[in-house]
Amino acid sequence: MSLQFILGNSGSGKSHYLYQQIVNESMEHPEKNYLVLVPEQFTMQTQRDLCAAHPRGGIMNIDALSFMRLAYRVFEEVGREEQPVLDDEGKNLVIRRIAGKLEDDLKVLKGNLKKQGYISEVKSVISEFVQYGVDFDKLDDFMEGLSQESYLYYKLQDIRKVYEGFEEYLRDRYITKEEMLDVLARAVCDSELLKGSVIALDGFTGFTPVQIRLISELLKVSEKVIVTVEIDRREDPFIYRHPYQLFALSKQMVTSLVKLSLIHISEPT
């Protein structure tokens, strides 16, 4: 396994270079799977770009996928039956129901529940808690450092109650799309699609902890993982000091991937 970074400024041709590399390798190794992972909104355009880069106009052993589409592909392959996935609209309905039941116990949220878009904001906060691994213990630890008379303390206390009710409702019924990547990470080792494949990640400015855990598993089974990184050529991508330095997100992404495990790092391009 190896990890390769393609570095460059915005508009420098990183994606074009990557797609050309993937196309050339796929023609030399038609027996191998090549997976290009991009943000959900870019999957269709990436498929078009790959087809345009291919001299035959087709991509038989190349797939352009998002993380979620990769999850469905792997689940279909390994025959893993998972609980139904609760989409964003479903989460809004569940959270509205739970908040309604808890209304008398809520101090801050109580007066805002009927405001347009407020439930959606609460849903977004809970989704980020899941993505970034903020469980109840971490939330409690953070709240202990706050004044118990502060607005933020009461608001987090309300969100914690709704979050707990949301988790209890989902248990043994549904999983969220944020949790799907953890399920996928556990299925990676059983997938023939992923074993010995070349996986490219393009168009990301950073990765959430759950995505990092998945990439860690992908590195174990794939032949190579290639990541495009937006950064100035004068910057050292392997030195991340603080979140306010230039290209901090890119440097944080690079250093977090390097730290995943004992990985051979291909020469930057």
For the regions a language model picked out, list residue spans one by one.
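Conserved phosphoryl-transfer catalytic core
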Residues: 92, 105, 224-240
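Accessory N-terminal region flanking or inserted into the helicase ATPase core
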Residues: 2-6, 14-17, 101-203, 210, ...
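Glycine-rich P-loop/Walker A and Walker A-like loops and their local beta1-loop-alpha1 context
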Residues: 3-29, 33-46
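Residue-level detector of conserved catalytic or cofactor/ligand-binding positions
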Residues: 261-269
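Conserved helicase core region in the C-terminal RecA-like lobe
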Residues: 63-70, 198-207, 211, 226
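Histidine-anchored nucleotide/phosphate-binding helix
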Residues: 22-24, 208-222
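Conserved P-loop NTPase-based nucleic-acid remodeling module centered on helicase motor cores
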Residues: 31-138, 147
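Acidic, Ser/Thr-rich peripheral helices and adjacent loops at domain boundaries
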Residues: 241-260
